[in-house]
Amino acid sequence: MHTAIRRAVMALVVLAVASAASAQPSSPFTAEDMLKVASVSVLDVTEDGSRVAASVRLPFDNATVDNRRYGDPTYLSPSNVTLQIIDARTGAIDTPFKGLVSVRTAAWSRDGKRLAILIAQDAAVPSGFPSAKLFVWETGRKALTEVPAGADTAVALNSSLAWTPDGAAILVALRDRTQDAAARAKFRELTEGPIVVHKSTDPFLEWDLLGRDNRSRSIAALDPRTGAARPILPQARISSYEVSRDGAFLRVMEDATEKTDYETIGGTDNVLKFVDAATGQARTVMAAKDLKGLTLRWSDDGRWFAYAKKGEVFVQGIDGSAPRSLTPKPAKADAKGAEPDAATPGARTGDEKKPAEESFSVRSFSRDGSRLLVTSRKGWYVVKVADATRDLIVPLQEDEEKNPRLTAVGWSPDGAAIYATWGARDKWERGVVRIDVASKAMTPLVRDARLYGGVRLSRDGGTFIFTASDGDRPADLYTADARFSSAKKLTDLNPWIAGKSLPRSELVAYRDADGKRLYGVLRYPVNYEKGRTYPIIFELYETFFDNGFNARAAFLTNHGYAVFHPSVNLVVGQPGEAWVKGVTSAANRLIEMGVADPDKLGVQGTSYGGYATVLLITQTDRFKAAVNVSGKVDMVSFYTDSPRLGVRNTHAPEKSQDRIGGTLWDYPERYLDHSAILRADRIKTPLLTISGDQDPNVPASQSREIYYALRRLGKEVEWVRYVNGAHRPPDSVAESIDFEQRILAWYEAHLKKPEKKTDTSALGARR
């Protein structure tokens, strides 16, 4: 009954907001409006959930970047935000800084009375290098105080912040000021020369080493009143650090990498160390060779950690004791056919007919550290750390598509329940659930069509902080109690948008050419009329399911276009087939629905989506206009390019996003098959290709290749270069507006021009 009431209340709130918005006179959503849409990020929440530190960001304030300095450790890209301190009880908002600041991080003291704030200032005088400034905001006095800086060292721009339990000090990372000069000199050497030598005998790629040197930091405890620093750990390449709950020690991940790792993007071999906070004495707990490839989950007191290795869960203490398996692999029968010892914890799965071997992942410890949440394809388990007994609390079906989308948020402080976000697989029904560990009952706290994000539970377990939207408008920040019996809106970030015409969205199901069920997100043209067909633009990437405000879709739908984000089923080895199998099937479905005009189909994508777009139009001529933004077209030339990203462009096809499945020399035919440039002669769709000359990810040479190829072949193509731009090509407010308007103009010219009369009787079947 209570859940039904809560659903009804939330639905009424959504309806009231929608009705109020529809009652206002509306105007078109423009390219200029795209730069005005504010978004919120939560920096930290007090332990009792009463206050939230959040940053509010507008694209308008961050439109210009010096992209030529990508990879320069002494350059900071703009991240200009308004810092807000929000009282979650009253909704009152304080802004400690007048105007915009570049907030690096922020952390509340244990009592919630003070907030440490680290901000960055670029090209600080007199050094000419960016500098960090540390401030403390006192909630009682509503006063902002700058923490005095040291003479020879400064708080590192990549520092974490952590208060000691008594609030007497803030643990920070410090950086020697002389390191900045050396880093900038190395950057200039790599970019300006005049002579640059690269050697395969060097252990590191040059750009990889430059980035790692930025981790050289020391750790100290800073007195927030005087700025006096008490050293804890001398300078080292520190990847990350955390202070224990009682403040007695730090756990430190120290970079011990000996050479560039081609197996992982930004691969780092870390050593796990424990450092006494009082004496600075360090002790190695896990060597780099043992830690490699592991993700550690920590107990609340910081004295135990767990990890999964080859699907088996281990727990280990910081006292140097050996790791202990909590999910031992079933023992194999001996030569005489003896069965494994049934008394062995975890040796049996409960299925006596088939003791299937499960592969587990670790999620989190209970607050007291006595239990672990682990997951497998069979479900969610609670495992007792003491004796490794495990209890299945959320069973899952073998067919993943029949299970809800579940993501753990955290344990209740008393360990009685686990909270998770929940989403249906076949419709927009989403929310938050409470899973009772003892009874295994899953209780919906809130469940409706709204889109929930960034859900976090305060440490005391009494307050949820989250973002929510109706799926068509930008999200705002909300708070609710642990039962979701009351939800309160904390921000109104975009009140002006109530006067704008926005599209409505719909989840559309379809089957690809192989019969696999897929989903995509349709946004209808503003002022859509049922029974009338519209030009439609397909925006490609990988998979889509949830809606949510999309500024570009809002802009295009205001000009009479439907916009569809289709999903595809990507297969390692031959991913290129997925788009023609999936996107054309999605087009067929939208034509069947009476939404899409079959003669006015457009397609576009950015980065991987741009790559997909050009590859798609080499396989079908159904699309009458295409736009490639920062997408590759030549897998061979792309393979070892983009040096500032280290091994990213070799790793992507070998092991990750591009899904080729091996090196260029393992599968040369796959690289050729997925290079649109080699099939440019098959392209009949007019192509607009857009790039930024300073793109460190997908070089502008990729757009250059396809432009000159299509021009040579007599095809219709246009190449737009933003000389100062990068992977996001526009690099100013004016360029951002130009970018969106150029894309619109391309579609206006090719999807809305009068069609020539054709003999429809001669039309053949379409792929």
What are these regions (language model features)?
Residues 55-64, 173, 217-218, 253, ...:
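Non-catalytic accessory segments flanking enzyme active sites
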Residues 23-39, 75-78, 86-104, 128, ...:
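Multi-bladed beta-propeller domains
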Residues 102, 127-135, 141-164, 173-210, ...:
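Asp-box/WD-like beta-propeller blade repeats and closely related beta-sheet repeat scaffolds
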Residues 57-84, 174-220, 255-273, 326-350, ...:
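Predominantly five- to eight-bladed beta-propeller fold
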Residues 43-51, 106-115, 160-170, 241-250, ...:
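Blade-terminus and WD-like Trp-Asp/Gly-His loop motifs, strongest in beta-propeller folds
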Residues 59, 88, 98, 549-559, ...:
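Active-site-proximal cap/loop segments of hydrolase catalytic domains
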Residues 54-59, 116-128, 171-177, 208-213, ...:
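Beta-strand C-termini and the immediately following turn/loop, strongest in propeller blades
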Residues 524, 531-542:
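Short beta-strand element of the alpha/beta-hydrolase
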